[in-house]
A protein has these predicted regions:
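Histidine-anchored nucleotide/phosphate-binding helix
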Residues: 30-35, 127-137
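Active-site beta-loop-alpha junctions enriched in small/polar residues
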Residues: 47, 94, 147-149
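Short, charged, surface-exposed secondary-structure boundary motifs
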Residues: 98-100, 152-155
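Internal catalytic-core helix/loop-beta-alpha segment
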Residues: 70-124
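A short glycine-rich beta-strand->turn/loop micro-motif centered on a GG-aromatic cluster
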Residues: 116-120, 141-154, 174
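A short helix->loop->beta-strand "cap" motif at the edges of active sites that frequently abuts
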Residues: 38-40, 137-141
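Active-site acidic carboxylates
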Residues: 1-88, 109, 152, 158, ...
Length: 174
């Protein structure tokens, strides 16, 4: 059995850049500790937008340019990569179909014992990818480490954790 850690969008723009929050800054040490101590396979996702972001549906609904490909804000926080990750998946929207497909491939190679998600933002991309993992592999236990996540607001973080619990996603370290 293999265990999977998915590190969602731990990018400069979500930590202390265009969409950063004090809560996001505060989880960085927890995220690093979790990555360093994890003995399974690690996959990162990276929110990736283009220069035309403001002309996209997301840009119309969230008119704050962020994670523009190859910008500083798009980069994963220094120090988090380089701990044996097997992939960094760029994604143009909240959930990553490529992540779901990779999880299926990994499951075919060796059964997955657990999937844990950490990162940003709890209420947008973490919940989207947690539900996606549950949809692709409904019999694999999926969890989220709340101490390694932050939402757009503290309340939306709590709302997302409650919603994930209702969908049989375990919440650790609440």
């Amino acid at each position: 059995m293999q265990d999977i850690l998915i590190v969602v969008d731990m990018q400069n723009d979500f930590i202390d850049g265009a969409l950063g929050t004090p809560e996001a800054v505060a989880i960085v040490p927890n995220v690093l500790k979790k990555i360093e101590s994890f003995s399974g396979k690690i996959i990162f996702t990276r929110d990736t937008h283009q220069e035309n972001y403001m002309r996209t549906q997301e840009g119309a609904n969230l008119p704050v340019p962020h994670c523009i490909e190859n910008s500083f804000g798009w980069q994963i926080r220094e120090g988090l990569l380089g701990h044996g990750e097997i992939a960094v998946l760029d994604k143009p929207t909240f959930g990553s179909r490529e992540l779901g497909e990779m999880l299926l491939e990994l499951e075919q190679q060796e059964p997955i014992g657990s999937i844990c998600l950490i990162g940003l933002c709890t209420d947008i991309c973490v919940i989207s990818n947690a539900l996606l993992a549950k949809a692709f592999l409904p019999e694999v236990p999926v969890s989220v480490d709340a101490a390694c996540c932050a939402g757009v607001t503290p309340q939306s973080h709590l709302n997302a954790l409650a919603a994930m619990k209702m969908c049989q996603i375990a919440v650790e370290n609440e």
